[in-house]
Amino acid sequence: MRDDGTLQSYRSLSNIERVEVVKGPAGALYGRGSAGGIINLVTKRANGDNFTNVNGSVGSNSQFVGQVDSSMAFSDKVNGRINLEHRQADSYVNHVDSNDFFIAPTIRVLPAEGHTVDLDVEYAHQELVPYRGVPSKNGKPVDVSESSFYGGTNDYQESDSLRVGINYEWRLNSEWVWTNRAAYNHIELEQKGTRQGTVTGDKVSQTVNNFGYDPRTTTTMQSELVWETDSNQMMIGADYNQINIDLTLASDKTLPPKHIYNPVVGATPDPGFKPFRDNTTTTTGIYLQDVYTLGDLSVIGNVRYDSMELEQQKAGKAQEKLDDNKVSYRGGLVYRINNDMSVYASLARSWQLPYSGIYINPKLAEFFHTDLKEVGAKAYLLDNALMLNAAIFQIDQEQPQTNINGDVINKIEARHQGIELEARGQITELWDISVGYSYLDAEDKDTGKKPNDVSDHLFSLWSTYQLYENWRLGGGVKYVGDRYAGNNEAVALGDYTTVDLMAAYTTGRHKVQANAYNVLGEKYILGATSGKSGTNQIGYGAPAEFMLSYGYQF
């Protein structure tokens, strides 16, 4: 899984129990991200089960994945679990490869009735060659092979990260639960990357941009108290988050231009890593949420207050500061039509730090805010085996621009509005399905142009069927509509459709599974970096690829 966009790395999912996509106005509760929703990763816990799962996979482009998930009970009050993963692969792109190692032990202690303590440790080492895609010409990506590489043969990225977390839950009684969390994350990273610049004729300019974290640390503390009765669910909480970044940066702009249709690659200069700036971002928040149910009607409300402070020290320059206090909110109604169907309406506002708070730009001295309005319906059919959901939404974001004195001189306003339809669950005991469709009308309100890399139509379908006792077959289709790279719809990325298939055979403790991705060999654009640079850093998606896996449970 790609990170949040600021770490420039990938996160292993080997110790993740499930990935929750929390759609809608979650921003006021969590205080981070957009009112459009968040992604929540739920880690595996040491719950006292005794098992060991071993999995190995081989696939296209010399891909190999090895995983171990082992759980044990040391005593009636202490449990342990450990997840390990090693990945290595070449790529469909020439000169691009990766090598990762991940280990995540966790211990659960039950010191007394109603008390649970979870201690987590995660360590990851990652080596990869950064891929910056292909340039564009005349409003389209250049038509070259997906394997084309425009970087330097000595480009690299190497990172080491360590995360330590503790979670303490105290069930005071049947109605009250008090949860406290603390986590510390430390990452050191170096990247040497050769990037495309501006296209002139059939040549594209290039620069080498080196950057690193030396280090980047994140400290998080959170406390929540939940009171739950038959008719009321109330949560009050507080959290503290601090990000410290020691950024190194250097560049070399002396590279000769490269031919866009026939890139000849070789080693590029390495300008090293020089101290550039130190940043500290501190956020302290308190929040309250309440859900009160009266008959078939539930009223939802929550409010959050944040105090945010940013400090920045660039090498050889005066210290810069940015601080503000903001209030986010959410309100909603849910009406239960019958035991199987409900309708709802909600509105929310949340605040975001420019550039996710990782640095200060004097021209963006005001925080962004996002407003969401949504109405929808949800139904559970076939004895709750199948969930249906429909929603109509509108998201407005305002990004104030300021002068060097912090005065607002302009506002960039964007609107995303559309519909979303979803069905997920079991049609029969043997047949699972997950299908979704979204229509999204997104535009810059001043220009009427689409934002970077936002599609108007999205459709996905995945279904599996249990064929006989041992066999399970599945397949899916994904469609992504027309998109553009860069501002003002500078480069048309087009639409695409991919088809994936799978087959699995299980007998006893053994499981063999085959996966085929993009089986029709669709040539498509996966995405582009945001802003002006995205017009010449456009990534092709993978052609047809295959994976064969074997798993055994002890």
Where are the regions a protein language model picked out?
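Gram-negative outer-membrane beta-barrel transporters
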Residues: 228, 296, 394-396, 410-488, ...
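Structural signature of Gram-negative outer-membrane beta-barrels, strongest in the C-terminal barrel
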Residues: 110-112, 216, 231-235, 239-242, ...
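Membrane-embedded beta-barrel scaffold of Gram-negative outer-membrane proteins
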Residues: 167-171, 177-193, 343-344, 367-442, ...
